[in-house]
A protein has these predicted regions:
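Outer membrane beta-barrel strand-and-loop segments of large Gram-negative receptors
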Residues: 16-21, 26, 126, 145-229
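Surface-exposed extracellular loop regions of Gram-negative outer-membrane beta-barrel proteins
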Residues: 27-64, 71-81, 86-133, 147-171, 197-206, 233-253
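Transmembrane beta-strands of outer-membrane beta-barrel pores
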Residues: 3-5, 52-58, 66, 94-100, ...
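Transmembrane beta-strands of outer-membrane beta-barrel proteins
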Residues: 1, 46-50, 76, 90-92, ...
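Outer-membrane beta-barrel transmembrane domain signature of Gram-negative proteins
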Residues: 1-47, 61-64, 81, 210-235
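Conserved small/polar residues in nucleotide/adenosyl-binding loops
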Residues: 266-272
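Extracellular loop and loop/strand-boundary signature of outer-membrane beta-barrel proteins
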Residues: 13-22, 58-68, 116-123, 130, ...
Length: 272
């Protein structure tokens, strides 16, 4: 169990000296943490923890003070594991976390992309919390079947909107009401002799992002997607020199990001 306290003071996100003297952001945070674990016989075990965090941010611009964030947040984490026998294991994982925006995301500074587009920082951007749950079944200590759900209130992403005073597109990180994802997946490892070692991951999920107030607009975007991932290791030579080739691929049928409806995405990489 521990308790800590943190105070950060940042002077001026602007690059001009006169603006540096007139803008100030202060952040205060404190948290307490408690964890317990227990084995119930030889089949069932449990670990649980809870973190309580207080976070506040004050912003002063040209003598005008405002409170950006003033929140108490609970972060529960738990792992429950039940071993029917070594060939059948059931596990429930619950986790939570917090993601803070980067320095440049909250810098109230305009960076031109071209004559018609700019990137603008958002000093009122809030950190977002994430809550995740997974129900996992492990078969023969090898194959994994899982169901998952991720809920992220105040999720942020870079979104475009039209400037009302001039003909420009503005790209700025914005907090959404929430992001929600849930689905099922399976992980299958296999080996072909001593030459090929591989792991295949298949998943299907529903993605959803919602924001009621977005520059006089609103959106509620959702999509069903499928994912395929394959990691491969090929042993080219076991004697000296020991040569191995890693070849990995990832494919997803689509995704959503705010107002965007993204098409299929894929990546591949190789290393020796």
């Amino acid at each position: 169990t521990y308790i800590d306290y943190l105070y950060n003071k940042g002077n001026g996100y602007e690059s001009a000296l006169d603006e540096l003297e007139n803008n100030r952001q202060k952040e205060y945070s404190g948290n307490a943490f408690l964890e317990v674990s227990k084995d119930f016989g030889s089949h069932f075990s449990a670990t649980a923890s809870l973190k309580v965090e207080y976070f506040k941010s004050d912003y002063t611009s040209n003598g005008m003070k405002s409170t950006l964030w003033n929140d108490w947040t609970l972060f529960p984490n738990a792992t429950l594991s039940y071993t029917v026998n070594p060939m059948h294991i059931i596990q429930l994982d619950i986790s939570s976390d917090k993601t803070y925006p980067s320095y440049w995301d909250v810098t109230p500074q305009e960076s031109p992309i071209n004559s018609y587009s700019v990137i603008l920082g958002n000093p009122s951007l809030k950190p977002y919390r994430s809550y995740s749950g997974q129900l996992i079944y492990i078969l023969k200590q090898k194959y994994t079947i899982l169901a998952f759900c991720d809920y992220v209130p105040d999720y942020f992403a870079q979104l475009p909107y039209q400037n009302t005073s001039e003909l420009k597109n503005v790209f700025r990180y914005e907090n959404m009401d929430y992001q929600l994802q849930f689905g099922v997946g399976v992980i299958v490892p296999f080996r072909v002799g001593e030459f090929w070692n591989s792991q295949v991951t298949l998943a299907g999920q529903r993605m959803q992002e919602k924001l009621d107030h977005f520059h006089d607009l609103s959106f509620h975007n959702d999509k069903y997607t499928g994912q395929f991932k394959m990691d491969n290791t090929f042993t080219l030579s076991k004697s000296r020199p020991n040569l191995k080739l890693d070849l990995n691929g990832y494919f997803v049928t689509g995704a959503v990001q705010g107002i965007y409806d993204l098409c299929l995405l894929y990546t591949s990489d190789a290393a020796d």
